[in-house]
């Protein structure tokens, strides 16, 4: 990389200055003078090196970009000149005086001998500017160098097929639009230009090609005057007159042209219609009604479960002949709760022919049968929690649909104890919401056991629970029968299909309302108790929900004690 850099070895033998310093010992570089323009076209008199000159640098032998001065032809723009300084901001300073090391002064204490020594000069290769770019005839083809170092001129070919200068299209870097004058031409103008006004019509005021139109004029209506092209803005008193005239003109949708295929509407529908808006009698959004009848429109007597008995005469109260409470035919076909007997697996024959049964005489002309509370309780009583039987050990066969890994049937986790859910209404939801979300107050302990737990940060609470005196019943355990020749392994074999032991939840017929709330005719009094057939049965046989709550409270007290 640095092998071609020039090295000056004589600098090590001498000092900073030469031995002999004089007015001819150094060479001051002068700037080259450019050739002045002449009559030759296409910049033919610009400097150009000849092919015979051998230069040390290969880049200096061939003219590079921007070698020719074309600024005089490009920037000679006609127009005004702005007041600006065209001098360069940063000039290249060239000192005319000698530089350091040009003079060779003798050292102090030595004999000064003024002997001038000639310093060898290196021949400087410079470009020859005398040869023009368009050479003379017969010398434009160059020379040929022979083997004996003789130069021989090349002869021109018999025919010249080269393209002349008129066929070249020089491409400049700057477009013509950027070379135009962009200043203010106010100072360059010599006179004022007046705006010429033409008296003729302007563009778009007339149509050259006019089409003949057939004009139909009504005698009763005057022809509109089209010579007024200004905008008409009515005043207040004129706007009132125009609004009154508009009221006499029918609006959109006022006319309803009847078609041959339209259905004639009855006059009763127009009476009940709301008031018309915007003087229009047509409805904007008509309801889409289906032509098919709705479910329950027809009452077929042959397939109906119960047909209401028609009455004629003055026995009908309130001028009503329809039943007060109609029963759904789909609900009558399906069996209700308590319809099946689980113990016998036989459907109760409670469906009777309603036509053969004589209907009792009811009050207020109502034809809907009303049954007593006892009959309703017997008809709709479902199985309670005590009606189900616990599955015994003999019902299930051993090793039925079971697969165990390594023949192990030991249970991995102990069975979870079944907890009974409290009855609905046992908790006060509104009170708990107010205490937790609204007031943010905690209730004091209500029992003695809770007081012990709240004191001393639960230090008085027992660590182990007490022994439960009430043991499990005989049907609590469900033993798994094993084969006699089973191989016991140490690996646990879980069941493939395990049964889901859910928590105990009461059935739909576990709870029932009081007969005073359920029956509409029974009213509670303070002094007199109405005779009811269900009262003696209620004393002896308690409600299964009350039994469940009492047993749950008893187990809860035993659990805390």
UniProtKB/Swiss-Prot annotation:
Q: Which UniProt keywords apply?
A: Repeat
Asked whether the keyword Repeat is assigned, the reply is yes
- In the record for this protein, the STPGR repeats are positioned at 21-34, 63-72, 97-104, 164-191, 200-210, 250-285, 292-299, 334-367, 421-438, 471-481
Q: Please list where the region (Disordered) is annotated.
A: 123-143
Superkingdom in the source lineage: Eukaryota
The cross-references to PANTHER family, in alphabetical order and at most eight, read: SHIPPO-1-RELATED, SPERM-TAIL PG-RICH REPEAT-CONTAINING PROTEIN 2
Instruction: List the protein's name.
Output: Sperm-tail PG-rich repeat-containing protein 2
What broad taxonomic lineage does this protein's source fall under? Eukaryota, Metazoa, Chordata, Craniata, Vertebrata
């Amino acid at each position: 990389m640095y092998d071609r850099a020039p090295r000056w070895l004589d600098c090590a033998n001498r000092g900073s200055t030469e031995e002999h310093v004089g007015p001819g010992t150094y060479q001051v570089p002068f700037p080259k003078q450019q050739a002045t323009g002449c009559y030759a076209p296409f910049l033919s008199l610009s400097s150009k090196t000849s092919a015979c000159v051998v230069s040390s640098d290969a880049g200096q032998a061939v003219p590079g970009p921007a070698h020719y001065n074309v600024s005089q032809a490009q920037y000679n723009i006609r127009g005004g000149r702005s007041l600006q300084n065209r001098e360069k901001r940063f000039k290249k300073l060239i000192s005319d005086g000698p530089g350091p090391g040009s003079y060779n002064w003798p050292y102090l204490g030595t004999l000064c001998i003024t002997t001038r020594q000639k310093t060898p000069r290196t021949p400087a290769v410079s470009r020859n500017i005398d040869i023009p770019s368009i050479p003379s005839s017969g010398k434009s083809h160059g020379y040929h160098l022979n083997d004996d170092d003789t130069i021989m001129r090349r002869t021109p070919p018999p025919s010249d097929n080269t393209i002349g200068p008129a066929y070249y299209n020089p491409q400049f870097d700057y477009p013509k639009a950027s070379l135009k004058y962009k200043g203010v031409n106010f100072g360059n103008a010599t006179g004022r230009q007046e705006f010429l006004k033409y008296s003729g019509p302007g563009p778009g005021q007339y149509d050259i090609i006019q089409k003949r139109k057939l004009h139909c004029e009504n005698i009763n209506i005057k022809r509109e005057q089209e010579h007024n092209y200004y905008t008409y803005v009515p005043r207040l008193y004129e706007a009132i007159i125009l609004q009154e005239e508009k009221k006499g003109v029918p609006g959109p949708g006022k006319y309803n042209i009847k078609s041959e295929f339209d259905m004639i509407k009855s006059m009763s529908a127009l009476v009940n219609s709301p008031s018309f808006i915007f003087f229009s009698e047509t409805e904007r959004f008509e309801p889409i009604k289906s032509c098919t009848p709705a479910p329950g429109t027809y009452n077929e007597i042959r397939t109906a479960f119960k047909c209401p008995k028609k009455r004629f005469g003055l026995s009908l109260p309130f001028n009503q002949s329809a039943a007060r409470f109609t029963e759904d035919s789909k609900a009558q076909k399906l069996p209700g709760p308590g319809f099946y007997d689980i113990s016998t697996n036989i459907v109760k024959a409670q469906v009777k022919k309603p036509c053969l049964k004589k209907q009792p005489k009811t009050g207020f002309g109502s034809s809907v049968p009303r049954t007593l509370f006892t009959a309703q309780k017997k008809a709709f009583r479902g199985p309670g929690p005590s009606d189900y039987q616990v599955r015994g050990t003999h019902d299930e066969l051993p090793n039925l649909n079971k697969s165990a890994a390594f023949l192990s049937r030991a249970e991995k986790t102990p069975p979870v104890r079944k907890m009974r859910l409290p009855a609905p209404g046992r908790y006060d939801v509104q009170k708990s919401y107010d205490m937790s979300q609204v007031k943010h107050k905690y209730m004091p302990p209500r029992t003695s056991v809770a007081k012990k737990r709240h004191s001393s940060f639960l230090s008085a609470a027992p660590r182990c629970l007490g022994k439960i005196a009430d043991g499990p019943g005989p049907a609590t355990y469900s033993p798994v029968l094993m084969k006699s020749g089973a191989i016991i392994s140490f690996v646990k074999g879980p069941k493939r299909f395990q049964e889901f032991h859910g928590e105990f939840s009461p059935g739909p017929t576990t709870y029932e309302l009081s007969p005073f709330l359920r029956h509409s005719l029974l009213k509670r009094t303070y002094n007199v108790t109405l005779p009811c057939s269900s009262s003696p049965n209620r004393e002896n046989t308690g409600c299964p929900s009350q039994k469940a709550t009492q047993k749950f409270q008893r187990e809860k007290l035993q659990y805390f004690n």
